[in-house]
C-alpha cells in the first residue's frame, strides 16, 4: 500500500523541502509514498487570487477564507473521499509516536497548512478536521509542521528504514520512552572513554545497560513517561 499525502498550502514551492532528502526522499523516489501539493490560491476566484480577509469582530492580522479553502478541500475529496483530514494547529493534539503510527496506516491523508492568523473555524468544523500540534510554540505557518508530521509517519512505513531495530529502539518507541546514549569509534576521545560494558561482548549485560540508561534518562528529562511502579529494578 502506497502512503499518499496531499498538502494544501499557499506556498507549494516549499515542498518537498527536507522531505526530498535521506531515507524519506529515497522512499519518495521509490514510490513507497506519494506527495501531492495543491496551491490553495488556484481556487481563489478574484483577479488578485485573494485567500484571506479581515476577521469578524476585529482583531490583528488576517484570516484564511472559508470559501477558497473549502473549494480546495472539495477538489481533494472528489477523488479521495476516504482521506484523513489534518490541520496543523498550535491548539491541536500534541503529536507523539502513537499518533504517527496510527496515521501511517492510512492510505491517504490531507494536511491543511494555515497562514496569517489562521483558518476560518467553519472550515475545520464542517469537514471535521483532526487538529495536530508539534509543540507549545508558534510558527509562521503549517508547512514546516506538516513536514515534521509527514517524516514521523513515513519512516514507520515498512521498507523506508532498512533496519527495523532502529525504529524499535528509538525514543518514544522503546520501553522507557527516551533512547539510551549512543557511542562509536574511537573508544577514547579527549580522555572520555566509552562505557566498558559496551565493549565487553556480554550481550546480556549490554541489553541491561541500555534498559537502565533509557529509564534513567527518561526519568530525569521526561518523568511523566516512566512507570514508577516498575522503575525500582532499573535504578
Swiss-Prot record:
It comes from the Bacteria. The keyword Cytoplasm applies. S-adenosyl-L-methionine binds at residues 114, 134-139. It is found in: Cytoplasm. It catalyses: guanosine(37) in tRNA + S-adenosyl-L-methionine = N(1)-methylguanosine(37) in tRNA + S-adenosyl-L-homocysteine + H(+). Keywords: Cytoplasm, Methyltransferase, S-adenosyl-L-methionine, Transferase, tRNA processing. The keyword S-adenosyl-L-methionine applies. Homodimer. This is tRNA (guanine-N(1)-)-methyltransferase. It comes from Ehrlichia ruminantium (strain Welgevonden).
Amino acid at each position: 500500500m502506497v502512503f499518499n499525502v496531499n498538502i494544501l498550502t499557499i506556498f507549494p514551492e516549499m515542498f518537498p523541502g527536507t522531505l526530498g532528502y535521506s531515507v524519506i526522499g529515497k522512499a519518495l523516489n521509490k514510490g513507497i509514498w506519494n506527495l501531492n501539493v495543491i496551491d490553495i490560491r488556484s481556487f481563489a476566484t478574484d483577479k488578485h487570487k485573494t485567500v484571506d480577509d479581515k476577521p469578524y469582530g476585529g482583531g490583528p492580522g488576517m484570516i484564511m477564507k472559508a470559501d477558497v479553502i473549502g473549494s480546495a478541500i472539495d477538489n481533494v475529496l472528489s477523488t479521495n473521499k476516504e482521506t484523513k483530514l489534518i490541520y496543523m494547529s498550535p491548539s491541536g493534539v500534541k503529536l507523539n509516536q502513537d499518533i504517527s503510527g496510527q496515521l501511517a496506516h492510512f492510505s491517504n491523508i490531507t494536511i491543511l497548512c494555515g497562514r496569517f492568523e489562521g483558518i476560518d473555524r467553519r472550515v475545520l468544523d464542517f469537514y471535521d478536521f483532526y487538529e495536530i500540534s508539534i509543540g507549545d510554540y508558534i510558527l509562521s505557518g503549517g508547512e514546516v509542521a506538516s513536514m515534521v508530521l509527514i517524516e514521523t509517519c513515513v519512516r514507520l512505513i515498512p521498507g523506508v528504514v532498512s533496519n527495523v531495530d532502529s525504529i524499535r529502539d528509538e525514543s518514544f518507541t522503546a520501553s522507557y520512552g527516551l533512547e539510551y546514549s549512543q557511542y562509536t569509534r574511537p573508544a577514547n576521545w579527549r580522555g572520555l572513554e566509552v562505557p566498558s560494558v559496551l565493549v565487553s561482548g556480554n550481550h546480556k549485560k549490554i541489553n541491561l545497560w541500555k534498559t537502565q540508561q533509557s529509564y534513567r534518562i527518561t526519568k530525569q528529562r521526561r518523568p511523566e513517561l516512566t512507570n514508577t511502579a516498575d522503575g525500582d529494578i532499573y535504578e
